[in-house]
């Protein structure tokens, strides 16, 4: 026997989900402002789900940070799986139609939906293959479309692996390091170049660049523990959640720009290799 659809009850549940999602975002931001581990958890999630907005990465970090593959019930049914009994799902925000406010500005309706990790379904999670790209190739990909020059030096101040100079628009790299050390250093310092929009202070953005470097290491299979966040600088602990969120957007944007540029290089490289193989 089919249940009668109760529109009011449905609307009430949707409103409860909306309020819960927005409260969760605010609570997670507040926690991240004083908890280095919580901040690193967010970076871990953003590294896995690069297409997710800051708000949705915050929601995943708050509800199921170990998630690896997310989709709604219809998505999993399409794969031949079903949601396990008792699983309530993960609240995410989904942009809807745009609208015009009374003051003439544009806005976007936000819908709240529930998604599920593959571990919450009857399907068996498949272990993702480890990134096996050559580190030198990854480095070439990272600097190929960089908005700055890259130069090498025998020594850098304080023995740093790499150093971005806003004045010279150059990332200087210290010679004599392992490829992994160079990757970590360049990933962090290259972030400065992507963040630099003029009158740039490297010192004021060291923490943001560290976060970008950590995300890039995770995405490319490089050990990024030396760039992990254990404690936030004081200025971030004193920020209002809304301001901290803007910094998270800057981190996400820079990390995704570098990742996109790397993909462009690696995809062209792979495409060229396939063409040469076909010609043989």
Regions found by a protein language model. Give the residues of each.
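N-terminal accessory/interface modules of nucleic-acid-binding and processing proteins
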Residues: 1-280
């Amino acid at each position: 026997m089919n249940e009668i659809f109760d529109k009011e009850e449905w609307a009430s549940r949707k409103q409860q989900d909306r309020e819960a999602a927005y409260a969760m975002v605010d609570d997670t931001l507040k926690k991240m402002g004083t908890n280095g581990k919580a901040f690193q958890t967010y970076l871990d999630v953003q590294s896995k789900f690069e297409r997710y907005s800051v708000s949705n990465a915050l929601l995943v970090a708050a509800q199921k940070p170990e998630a690896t593959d997310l989709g709604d019930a219809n998505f999993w049914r399409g794969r031949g799986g079903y949601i396990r009994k008792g699983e309530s799902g993960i609240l995410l925000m989904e942009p809807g139609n745009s609208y015009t406010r009374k003051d003439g500005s544009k806005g976007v309706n936000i819908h709240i939906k529930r998604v599920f990790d593959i571990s919450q379904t009857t399907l068996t999670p498949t272990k993702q293959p480890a990134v096996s790209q050559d580190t030198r190739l990854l480095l070439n990909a990272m600097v190929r479309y960089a908005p700055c020059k890259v130069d090498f030096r025998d020594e850098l101040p304080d023995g740093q692996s790499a150093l971005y100079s806003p004045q010279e628009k150059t990332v200087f790299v210290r010679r004599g390091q392992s490829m992994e050390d160079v990757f970590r250093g360049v990933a962090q310092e290259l972030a400065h170049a992507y963040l630099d929009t003029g009158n740039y202070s490297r010192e004021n953005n060291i923490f943001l660049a560290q976060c970008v470097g950590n995300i890039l290491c995770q995405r490319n299979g490089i050990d990024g523990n030396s760039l992990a966040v254990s404690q936030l600088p004081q200025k971030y602990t004193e920020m209002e959640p809304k301001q901290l969120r803007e910094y998270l957007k800057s981190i996400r944007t820079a990390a995704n720009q570098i990742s996109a540029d790397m993909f462009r290089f690696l995809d062209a490289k792979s495409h060229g290799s396939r063409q040469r193989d076909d010609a043989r």
